[in-house]
Amino acid sequence: MQLKRVAEAKLPTPWGDFLMVGFEELATGQDHVALVYGDISGQSPVLARVHSECLTGDALFSLRCDCGFQLEAALSHIAEEGRGILLYHRQEGRNIGLLNKIRAYALQDQGYDTVEANHQLGFAADERDFTLCADMFKLLNVEQVRLLTNNPKKVEILTEAGINIVERVPLIVGRNPKNAHYLDTKAAKMGHLLNSKPAE
């Protein structure tokens, strides 16, 4: 187990009241958060989203990505379901960090795509470690998940880490002229399962 559960408190949101559970990585002290809605106990699969931190999209309303749109849609879907979990995975910029993400944005402004920009900075296309999220699910006593994601890699890694993903639930929102090339690159080069739905 790479994490420990350290704190929890109620978190009222526009979609309802969640329980915010804080975790800490044993090796680094890095914190991560789960938002739990309703009663997630029992054997029924739980609707869940693993959402990687994106300051620009989640908090600063950036149109360069679909992250903020996905965060809101996931919380809404979970509340409508009546039970579920959102894991807020503190690995900014696909785990290259905020400042390197800004550097990657600058390269994208020069014509590189999101994958090429990471490579120019010496990083893989995706540096995230989703095994931490498997530990978070286990600490919440959740073994079966209906995962809100367009990323097959998340399904594969969580499955390998012992989480039973019984269904992948698409979460396709937020496409706009500012992020269309970014989303097309994620589909073409990173295997994300996206279609050409217009902006919502």
From Swiss-Prot:
Keywords: GTP-binding, Hydrolase, Metal-binding, Nucleotide-binding, Riboflavin biosynthesis, Zinc. Its EC number is 3.5.4.25. It is an enzyme of class 3 (hydrolase). The active site is at D126, R128. The keyword GTP-binding applies. One of its GO terms (cellular component) is cytosol. Binds 1 zinc ion per subunit. Signal peptide: none annotated. Its cofactor is Zn(2+). GO terms for biological process: riboflavin biosynthetic process. The keyword Nucleotide-binding applies. GO terms for molecular function: GTP binding; GTP cyclohydrolase II activity; zinc ion binding. It catalyses: GTP + 4 H2O = 2,5-diamino-6-hydroxy-4-(5-phosphoribosylamino)-pyrimidine + formate + 2 phosphate + 3 H(+). Zn(2+) binds at C54, C65, C67. Pathway: Cofactor biosynthesis; riboflavin biosynthesis; 5-amino-6-(D-ribitylamino)uracil from GTP: step 1/4. InterPro entries: GTP_cyclohydro_II, RibA, RibA-like_sf. Gene3D superfamilies: GTP cyclohydrolase II (3.40.50.10990). GTP binds at R49, V50, H51, S52, E53, Q70, E92, G93, R94, T114, T149, K154. Homodimer. Belongs to the GTP cyclohydrolase II family. Catalyzes the conversion of GTP to 2,5-diamino-6-ribosylamino-4(3H)-pyrimidinone 5'-phosphate (DARP), formate and pyrophosphate. This is GTP cyclohydrolase-2. It comes from Klebsiella pneumoniae (strain 342). The lineage of its organism: Bacteria, Pseudomonadati, Pseudomonadota, Gammaproteobacteria, Enterobacterales. The gene is ribA.
